[in-house]
UniProtKB/Swiss-Prot annotation:
It comes from the Bacteria. This is Glycine cleavage system H-like protein. SUPFAM superfamilies: Single hybrid motif. InterPro entries: 2-oxoA_DH_lipoyl-BS, GCV_H/Fam206, Single_hybrid_motif. It comes from Streptococcus pyogenes serotype M5 (strain Manfredo). The keyword tRNA processing does not apply. The modification N6-lipoyllysine is found at residue 56. Disulfide bonds: none annotated. Lipoylated GcvH-L directly interacts with SpyM50868, which reverses the SirTM-mediated mono-ADP-ribosylation of GcvH-L, and with the oxidoreductase SpyM50865. Changing residue 24 to A: Large decrease in ADP-ribosylation.
Length: 110
């Protein structure tokens, strides 16, 4: 099941929620040249997940859900352009667990 919030895609697989950028956001910000994850192991709604610099903007990516961070796309810190990829296995940002199912269900369907 996929949901969308803040130009981010959230895909639920079992109890894991993978957050990635929508193609619209990727297009709007341009080529990403720098990406830095925050060290938070638990996120609240609107906490910063990732700071990035792209050809069209500098921005912070905010979490659409609260949950525990179990994985970060650390490869994106070495190769930030991975976040521009069309491939889901390359462009993901973080994986969360311990997410409130009702909060996920309340998001817009993708």
């Amino acid at each position: 099941m996929k949901k969308i919030a803040n130009y981010l895609l959230i895909e639920k697989t079992d109890d894991r929620y993978t957050i990635s950028m929508t193609p619209e956001l990727q297009d709007d910000i341009g080529t990403i040249g720098y990406a830095e994850f925050t060290d938070n192991d638990h996120l609240a709604v609107d906490d910063i997940i990732l700071n990035l610099e792209a050809s069209k903007t500098v921005m912070s990516v905010l979490s659409p859900l609260a949950g525990a961070v179990v994985e970060r796309n650390e490869a994106a810190t070495l190769t930030p352009t991975l976040l521009n990829s069309e491939k889901a296995e390359e462009n993901w940002i973080v994986v969360l667990t311990d997410v409130d199912q009702a909060a996920f269900d309340a998001l817009e369907d993708a």
